[in-house]
């Protein structure tokens, strides 16, 4: 079984959109249940023009990923599906944990508890990992192709956020940054 390019582009009810939109739904539910934490998470008042461009490009790329996932059927009964499902489920659980860890953080302080002990950007990382799981479970090269710019533009957002955190939280954030990888156990 190999990654499929043209053969997987078909609309269906049992396609990659189900887990893809579930990841988006988690974000929406968090914003509704915890409006203060949600407000803090989406505050872009400090964005530079470059950060705004990255945010716009990342949002457009995320929309493309979600749209392409509608046309990417799962490869049920294959190793692709099994491995992709396991990757997705692990990422989904850790993605949810990252929201609860974020909520537990105190306003005005660097969030360092929960899963933030292992990653400075767990929401981004586990969203990407979950979407990679969907790519694997569908064996869709189309989906993988649109994931690449999404990951690149999101990385640009992360770099901007880290500059902001360093300027805002100073030495405390620099110490946190020195001991905690940007992406779960890497970098």
Question: Model-predicted segments: where are they?
Answer:
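Histidine-centered phosphotransfer motif of kinases
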Residues: 117-125
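Membrane-anchoring alpha-helices and their flanking helix-loop junctions
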Residues: 1-113, 125-187
């Amino acid at each position: 079984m190999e990654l499929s390019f043209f053969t997987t582009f078909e609309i269906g009810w049992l396609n990659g959109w189900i887990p893809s939109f579930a990841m988006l739904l988690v974000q929406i539910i968090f914003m509704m249940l915890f409006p203060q934490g949600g407000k803090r998470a989406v505050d872009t008042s400090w964005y530079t023009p470059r950060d705004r461009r990255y945010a716009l490009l990342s949002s457009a790329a995320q929309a493309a990923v979600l749209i392409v996932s509608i046309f990417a059927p799962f490869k049920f009964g294959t190793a692709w599906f099994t491995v992709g499902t396991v990757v997705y489920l692990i990422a989904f659980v850790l993605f949810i944990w990252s929201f609860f860890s974020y909520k537990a953080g105190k306003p005005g302080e660097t969030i360092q508890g929960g899963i933030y002990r292992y990653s400075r950007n767990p929401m981004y990382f586990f969203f990407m990992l979950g979407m990679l799981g969907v790519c694997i479970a569908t064996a869709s090269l189309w989906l993988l192709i649109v994931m690449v710019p999404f990951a690149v533009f999101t990385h640009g957002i992360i770099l901007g956020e880290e500059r902001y955190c360093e300027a805002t939280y100073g030495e405390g954030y620099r110490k946190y940054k020195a001991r905690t990888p940007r992406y779960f156990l890497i970098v």
